[in-house]
Amino acid sequence: MKGNFKKSLSIFGALSFAFTAGFLLSNVNVYAATNQTLELNKDYYFDLNGDGQAEKIKYTTQVNKDDNDFFNSVSLFINDKNVYTKKLTDTWAKYTVLDIDSSDNTLELNLQIGGYSDVMDYSSFQRWNGASIVEFDNNKNKALNYTREYSFSNVKGNGRFNIVVDTPYSLPIGCFYANIPLKLQNNKITTTTGTYNLVGSSKKYKYKAKGNIKVYKKASKKSKVKFTVKKGDKIKMIKIKPM
């Protein structure tokens, strides 16, 4: 355990041994939503490309004929025309409409596709240019490369936003939710800080140390020990810093 803590995370301590270590729109809505997850097979109306005209938007899945629990592809329709299809055999998919940067007069679309236990196999960010869908970023990007479904928060149209991710990094503590701040600039999404807050009940969990744990000032072999958590001490994880 000491090696894992030292090599992968830098966790900050406090006296209490607390480590400083997702509104539904109507069917017709011509106004831009900043953070709207769409329902499958339901029509919505958004001005996606800032031309003053609302596009009719809907996404569907094509059910696997051999197993109704799975689909073989996800398709996006704009003004009743199939403009995008992702072929992937999975169990769930969702589209979210976002206005990440209101200064560009366009809306962003986020697609996530995955399987059981909210495991995510593909995600991408897209825009409608009036003629076709353009995918400008996806989960090959390290800042978006997570294995489970995420939701959006703090979308204010200034280019910055947060995603809340289920267990973005493997830790001995098991599952947890972390808030990851991101920004969109020049069609690229990047993280804005290296330290991520745990959210909801995740930051309230208490863990009991099974043995002494050395906590280092930095995730480095040359780092000095900040303090030692003693066997039996109770710990809360509040922040994480992946390296």
List the model feature ranges, each with a label.
Residues 55-59, 110:
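Structural core positions within WD40/WD-like beta-propeller blades
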Residues 51:
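Acidic carboxylate motifs that coordinate Ca2+ or other divalent cations, activating on Asp/Glu
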Residues 28-40:
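Low-complexity, acidic Ser/Thr/Pro-rich repeat tracts that form intrinsically disordered stalk/linker regions
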Residues 199-243:
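Beta-loop motif signature
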Residues 92-202:
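Short aromatic loop motif centered on NTY/YTY
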Residues 44-48:
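Calcium-binding motifs, dominated by EF-hand helix-loop-helix domains
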Residues 1-31:
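Sec-dependent N-terminal signal peptides of Gram-positive bacterial secreted proteins and lipoproteins
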Residues 33-36, 80-92, 137-139, 225:
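Blade-edge motifs of beta-propeller repeat domains
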